[in-house]
């Protein structure tokens, strides 16, 4: 793609070469602008999930293109194997994997992080001498997201709403306890309880028929 004539501009400001100081500052700024990456926005091209339920990596193409001296945008290459973060501490996690087409915010690390892989908990030497390189970025979140269709909404009025159109499964190896200060309501066309024994305390009110063998 190419910028319009109105948007084209030189990289050197007026007066950059007016003094030795200005020329030096221009050279320093050029190094910072071209070699030091901080945070940037990209689009996910592909995702490789981690083994088991661990997080994985994604290939991401930057959405802001570099430009040449004529103001023309340059083709941007996909940056491979960027690790993505998730909400997790210890063994507790909220698992949501990125998908191709997601627009994500990435942060470039100071050093080469290629030696810091899954399971690494001790400091490692940098994988190379590169600094602030986009190849050493970490995906920290999504931006300009789509309208979600499955979600958990936590509101400031102390309520939680869960929407899962395709199904909802709660699995545990221990007991499940529901505590409510009011009525617990279950609305469904059919409710099945698969248990060898059902125990109830208190009164049982039934509107309708009770069938059994």
Language-model segment annotations:
Residues 154, 160-163, 168-172, 176-178, ...:
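Low-complexity, small-hydrophobic/phenylalanine-enriched stretches
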